[in-house]
């Protein structure tokens, strides 16, 4: 699964996930893309599960790009531990997603195959998505 090799700080504040995605909001590498239409967080497990479903469906054809990376640590305290005594340990990693963010891109397959592969992948993700096509080469 995806996670940073090293970070400047082990734990981060919760923060807010507002606004629209101003970067990575167009199909840049492939021919077709899966674009987020809502705010949310994608865990490393969700990103990997969706990647597997895409690559299993397209088999050996096509090339895929993952446009998101889980770089935010989410902490959790152990079960039955009283409140206080500091922040919990890092449990998993997430990528924060804004509307308009491109999540996956693919090329080298027909539109029908790409559409079905992204439909299967979208079922594994916790944000609503839409299928987009590259407009300008």
Swiss-Prot record:
Alphabetically sorted, this entry's keywords are: Ribonucleoprotein, Ribosomal protein, RNA-binding, rRNA-binding, tRNA-binding
GO CC annotations, alphabetized: cytosolic large ribosomal subunit
**Biological process annotations from GO:** translation
Recorded superkingdom: Bacteria
A Pfam match is Ribosomal_L16
Matching InterPro entries, A to Z? Ribosomal_uL16, Ribosomal_uL16_bact-type, Ribosomal_uL16_CS, Ribosomal_uL16_dom, Ribosomal_uL16_sf
Q: Does the keyword rRNA-binding apply?
A: yes
Q: Quote the subunit structure annotation.
A: Part of the 50S ribosomal subunit.
What HAMAP family is this protein classified in?
Ribosomal_uL16 (MF_01342)
PANTHER family documented for this protein: 50S/60S RIBOSOMAL PROTEIN L16, LARGE RIBOSOMAL SUBUNIT PROTEIN UL16M
State the protein's purpose.
Binds 23S rRNA and is also seen to make contacts with the A and possibly P site tRNAs.
Question: Its family?
Answer: Belongs to the universal ribosomal protein uL16 family.
Q: Would you tell me the protein name for this molecule?
A: Large ribosomal subunit protein uL16
This protein's species is: Stenotrophomonas maltophilia (strain R551-3)
Q: Per UniProt, what is the name of the gene that codes for the protein in this document?
A: rplP
